[in-house]
């Protein structure tokens, strides 16, 4: 097996070499491990939730689609902050199976429609805003463009896409995203991106990046409009 140093130099992912298939395909075949992963991602959402909902006003969107939203922890917090909005939680069947309990716990289940599917195939239509938290950083550019292309197909003109990500800043100081950038590269041949890189990526799919909203946490909200 290649060393991590060689993986960094070549840009090839470790997990396919170790497990014989990409990370998310491997998780799909390992339900116990997938549960640990999904619970961990819910925990990561908890780190970002308060800062994201404090920094960004979701109340102007009637329908919010959480793409790759896992168990729905972020969507639940968004709907709590936007009491007149409704949500669509979209993720793989084995992932959203556990969502009703969490949504009920947070008293938003009656305002959420759960849709099963893969964002590589299609994304639910009808959203005013499409939220993707820690989705795009999991994928190299070609796959990221495919995902965002499906979001653009679902979204009408002037609708919004909101990427909640660790946006690499323009400084050399310590930043969490610089560590996860290396993790994404070694694990998935993916990476964290700067604001400029997100702007270029979004423009390839018919979005115009309008702003990057920093939060009190390391996460930022990259806002773009479908054109």
Q: Where in the sequence are the language-model features?
A:
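Alpha-helical subdomain
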Residues: 53-54, 58-227
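Conserved Class I S-adenosyl-L-methionine-dependent methyltransferase catalytic core
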Residues: 1-63
């Amino acid at each position: 097996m290649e060393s991590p140093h060689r993986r960094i130099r070549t840009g090839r992912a470790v997990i396919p070499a170790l497990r014989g298939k990409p990370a998310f395909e491997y998780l799909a075949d390992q339900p116990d491990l997938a549960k640990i992963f999904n619970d961990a991602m819910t925990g990561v959402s908890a780190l970002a939730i308060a800062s994201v909902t404090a920094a960004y006003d979701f109340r102007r969107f009637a329908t919010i689609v959480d793409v790759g939203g896992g168990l729905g922890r972020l969507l639940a917090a968004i709907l709590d902050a936007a009491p007149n909005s409704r949500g669509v939680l979209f993720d793989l069947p084995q992932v959203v199976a556990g969502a009703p309990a969490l949504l009920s716990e947070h008293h938003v289940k009656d305002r959420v429609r759960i849709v099963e599917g893969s964002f590589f195939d299609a994304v639910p239509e009808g959203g005013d805003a499409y939220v993707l938290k820690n989705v795009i950083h999991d994928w190299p550019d070609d796959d990221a463009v495919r995902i965002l292309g499906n979001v653009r197909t679902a979204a009408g003109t002037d609708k919004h896409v909101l990427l909640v990500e660790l946006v690499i800043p323009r400084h050399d100081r310590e930043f969490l995203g610089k560590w996860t950038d290396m993790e994404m590269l070694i694990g998935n041949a993916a990476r964290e991106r700067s604001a400029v890189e997100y702007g270029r990526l979004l423009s390839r799919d018919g979005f115009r990046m309008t702003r990057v909203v920093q939060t009190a946490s390391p996460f930022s909200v990259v806002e773009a409009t479908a054109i």
